[in-house]
Amino acid sequence: MEHTYQYAWIIPLLPLTVTMLIGLGLLLFPIATKNLRRMWAVPSVLFLSIGMLLSVELAIQQINQSSVYKYLWSWTINNDFSLEFGYLIDPLTSIMSILITTVGILVLIYSDNYMSHDQGYLRFFSYLSFFNASMLGLVTSSNLIQIYIFWELVGMCSYLLIGFWFARPIAANACQKAFVTNRVGDFGLLLGILGLYWITGSFEFRDLFELCNNLIPNNGVNSLFATLCAFLLFLGAVAKSAQFPLHVWLPDAMEGPTPISALIHAATMVAAGIFLVARLLPLFIVIPYIMNLISLIGVITLLLGATLALSQRDIKRSLAYSTMSQLGYIMLAPGIGSYRTALFHLITHAYSKALLFLGSGSIIHSMEPIVGYSPEKSQNMALMGGLTKYVPITKTTFFWGTLSLCGIPPLACFWSKDEILHDSWLYSPIFAIIAYATAGLTAFYMFRMYLLTFDGYLRIHFKKYSGNKKGSFYSISIWGQKELKPVNSNFLLSTVNNNEKVSFFSTKTSQIDGNVRPLMHSLSIHFSNLSKKDIFTYPHESDNTMLLPLLLLGLFTWFVGLIGIPFNQEEEGFDILSKWLIPPINLLHQNSSSPVDWYEFITNSILSVSISVFGIFTASLLYGSVYSSFKNMELINSVVKISPKRSLLDRIINVIYNWSCNRGYIDVFYARSLTMMIRGLAQLTHFFDRRVIDGITNGFGIVSFFVGEGIKYAGGGRISSYIFYYSSYVLIFVLIFYFFI
């Protein structure tokens, strides 16, 4: 066992080797390296697979023997300061290493085909391998300085990959936004690290925890300063894991290639913040204010992400807000003291979300030959629909991921999310109500996404999208801004009846172009009849190298939840994950000898599943073609129209829709307050520099110039005159000095 741990430092170096080899090949043999570019996918997958095998072996040894290994190299040592680098192998490290390597391998296999026609193929794989190396270095770090170094490397890689297609202005702006937003958190993290070093005199985790646990409860250090340091550390996690209010970069990060979205949202960047909170949880526990803040930020984020996902039309942005919401669940768990549950949901969500993102990439890949390569069209769910018969494997795996995220048993996310919901009741009923309500919203927007993508008919073949002011039930559209075009004839997507319209609650979609803007007036969408002479192209299923990762992630989505299921009813914690996490940290279940209450578990599960099923049913009712017999909900409309509160309901729906479409007005607030304030300050600084500072400098030059010119014309060229003037000036200064000083 000792022999295996000694070589654990190889794990983060393996993917880094690929990056170095690609760079060396481009430097020495540029033409051959570019011509044989797809060859580099093999060592990328191979080296990361070796890292995965080492991680699995370390995890097995830890499960069997509950061991923790730490190896350090002294870098700088003197009487007052010492800095050591090394690696720490404990249950948290092994969990994260397996997660990063398994998802990373599947993303690499998927990317080989997805990026095969891109000119930046080699650059993409070098960035991707460096990304994996940075994240593996982060999770194996033995102290806060190492964490900060790899933390910045992860941020740099995300900047490069989000802006991979930097020639597109929107991608360049997105990576800049991610970079600037994360700088706020990174600066807070750095200040927190320096503050803790000032308190404890050490960067090592064990020393930090021991000293803080002794000093803070016994008032050995200023509690306000310790709380401030802990808050600054948590601020780094807030930015990296896209928690409110530093979440604004996450939806824009979808401008990068889809495999990067899968990696960022599943196993690397957003998981880094959760990892930091989990690693520093022994420190946060002794500061109750920080624990309350963590849980509060988590519950706000999970609700905010769910509401913002309700009306998105971009399939990747919908998944991005879903990630934000699920990360809120994961952040809520350690805040309420449920460490094991947080890691459990981190694992299950990572595989499910990687499956959904790679599935969306397969969908986008199939749509691009039809609509073009613009993300505004290829990622627009308004142009999709009816893809079931064209991409059946993608549809099946996407359906698995959707059910898992909705919390439907026996898929993975059901087991972990249900534990978070149960623990939230023990901590705060208010938080529990919000968490349960968000579970219903999650089921709604996930099935909305699934139905808009796979149900009904392929909407791209319906030409001449147009708006019409004639009434439909609700006064808002599904996608946004109206387009004033004449309507020739109508064609309904789910039936062959004419004069059927699409509202916010219908199964259809509206206009495909323009910004997403709310409509306060009635807007219905019509489609002109198909021309029989037109020959259409249709989507096609992806290649095997893209489908294989989907199927493998589908298996993970089905079975990875088993690691957290207690199989022994007589003893709590008799599951793989609980044996793995030794020593456990759980403030809500401190009595580990109590048996598992299966009756309580089943009761809570029935409640959570019922809420999810209600969300699924609502989405199916409003967006599914199965209910087309209602003639576009005329029955429901007639019932609701009888109610005198219809106008109030309309206003509520409009408020929710406007909130979701405008990203909760948070981006607008930042743009109008922070951005405009910084630009105003920059303009003021520019004015002061040009007019005041430069004015003073230039003023001295101008005055000297005119004085010189005046003296030049006063002089006659006679030396005797110069001597006279000089003597006169000297005499005047002597007299002034003698009489007045």
UniProtKB/Swiss-Prot annotation:
Main location: plastid
Assigned EC number: 7.1.1.-
Keywords for the protein's UniProt record, in alphabetical order: Chloroplast, Membrane, NAD, NADP, Plastid, Plastoquinone, Quinone, Thylakoid, Translocase, Transmembrane, Transmembrane helix, Transport
A GO biological-process term: electron transport coupled proton transport
Transmembrane parts of this sequence: 9-29, 40-60, 89-109, 125-145, 147-167, 185-205, 219-239, 258-278, 280-300, 327-347, 396-416, 425-445, 547-567, 606-626, 721-741
Keyword Membrane: yes
Location of the protein in the cell: Plastid, Chloroplast thylakoid membrane
Catalyzed reactions per annotation: a plastoquinone + NADH + (n+1) H(+)(in) = a plastoquinol + NAD(+) + n H(+)(out); a plastoquinone + NADPH + (n+1) H(+)(in) = a plastoquinol + NADP(+) + n H(+)(out)
Cellular component terms (Gene Ontology): chloroplast thylakoid membrane
Recorded GO MF terms: NADH dehydrogenase (ubiquinone) activity; quinone binding
A Pfam family recorded for this sequence: Proton_antipo_N
InterPro entries: NADH_UbQ_OxRdtase_chlpt_su5_C (IPR002128), NADHpl_OxRdtase_5_subgr (IPR018393), ND/Mrp_TM (IPR001750), NU5C-like (IPR003945), Proton_antipo_N (IPR001516)
Role description: NDH shuttles electrons from NAD(P)H:plastoquinone, via FMN and iron-sulfur (Fe-S) centers, to quinones in the photosynthetic chain and possibly in a chloroplast respiratory chain. The immediate electron acceptor for the enzyme in this species is believed to be plastoquinone. Couples the redox reaction to proton translocation, and thus conserves the redox energy in a proton gradient.
Subunit annotation: NDH is composed of at least 16 different subunits, 5 of which are encoded in the nucleus.
Protein name (database record): NAD(P)H-quinone oxidoreductase subunit 5, chloroplastic
Gene from which the chain derives: ndhF
